[in-house]
Every structure is written in structure tokens, then in C-alpha cells.
Amino acid sequence: MFLVKALARVLKKDGILSIAKHNRAGRVMQMAVLLDDFEKANALLDGENSTASKFGAIRYYEDEDIIKWAPELTVSEVFGIRTFWDLQQNQEKHGDEDWQDKMMQLEMRVAQMPEYRKVAFFHHLLLTK
């Protein structure tokens, strides 16, 4: 919250702030589908925060909360990131360049479709002042 306020304060008029953030619904999908961790999936549904080995503590917030913290900002774009990529459990495919290209095309195609964005693992927000 404080970081968003500070960035909004120094952002120039017509400047763009780019924020990539965890998406709770995507994390629930990850816990339930990929990790078979129903306890963590239910805890997330109950509003609890989470942890990740690469990120440490994950404190979830809604995309709209950013505007509450810094009302001078406007959300201009929201993209879903990693909607399908991690759902492919055959790790050998992840190294195949043809598979990567096809998956990236699919990911880019659904990145701004609301129904897919809702379950993406991450959201990328572009905010303007």
C-alpha cells in the first residue's frame, strides 16, 4: 500500500505504472490442481494469505484495491499471466520450443479475456496518472 502511494506520487502526468501481482483465484487453482493441497486451497478461499518458496509471504489484494490506495491512478489495462502454462504437468514439454511458442500464443490470446484472466496465476496491471 505504502509503495503504491509512493510510486503514484512520483509518477509523472500521463506516466504508466506497471504492477505484476499474484491472483488469489489462480493460486487456489494451483493448490487444488497442481499440488493436491486442498488444505491450502481452502485456506485461500477463506481469505488467508500464502507463502511461496521463491517469493516468501504472499499478501493477496484485489486489483481494485490499488485505486483505493492511490485514487489519482486509473487502471488502463489488466492482463492475466500464466493462465495455462503451469497446468501442463509434463515438464519435458516446457523445454520444447514449439510447445513454448504455441503456449505463448494461447496465453497472449486469453490474457485480456475476463473469464480466463480471473483464473490466471498472476495479473499484470498498467495504471496511468
How does the language model describe each region?
Residues 2, 61, 108-111:
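Short, conserved clusters of charged catalytic residues that mark active-site
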Residues 2-16:
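A short glycine-rich, Lys/Arg-flanked "PGG" loop and its adjoining helix->strand segment in the class I
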Residues 2-3, 32-35, 92-93:
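Short, glycine/charged-enriched secondary-structure capping and boundary segments
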Residues 81-129:
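A C-terminal cap/extension of S-adenosyl-L-methionine-dependent methyltransferases
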Residues 37-59, 79-82:
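C-terminal alpha-helical "lid/dimerization" subdomain adjacent to the S-adenosyl-L-methionine
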